[in-house]
Amino acid sequence: MPRSLKKGPFIDLHLLKKVEAAVEKNDKKPIKTWSRRSMIIPDMIGLTIAVHNGRQHVPVFVSDEMVGHKLGEFAPTRTYRGHVADKKAKR
């Protein structure tokens, strides 16, 4: 279920402070975060945010189509290697 409109979007305060500082300085360095649950807000457009996927930080360049989505949606946590093919089916 989506979040109630009266509550507004959720964003961790430590991430919000880093975003505001980067916008103020016009800094293009990636912002490293573990907060996959934070929502992308319009202030983040044009920034690169390194989102942790459990193993490493995946760089995510934020565009205007991403506003309203969560950061974790753009850093996959699982690697799919495909199903093992049956040897009899190959013949």
From Swiss-Prot:
GO terms for molecular function: rRNA binding; structural constituent of ribosome. It comes from the Bacteria. It comes from Pseudoalteromonas atlantica (strain T6c / ATCC BAA-1087). HAMAP family: Ribosomal_uS19. One of its GO terms (biological process) is ribosomal small subunit assembly. Protein S19 forms a complex with S13 that binds strongly to the 16S ribosomal RNA. Transmembrane segments: none annotated. GO terms for cellular component: cytoplasm; small ribosomal subunit. Belongs to the universal ribosomal protein uS19 family. The keyword Thylakoid does not apply. This is Small ribosomal subunit protein uS19. Keywords: Ribonucleoprotein, Ribosomal protein, RNA-binding, rRNA-binding. The keyword Zinc does not apply. It holds the Pfam family Ribosomal_S19. PROSITE patterns: RIBOSOMAL_S19.
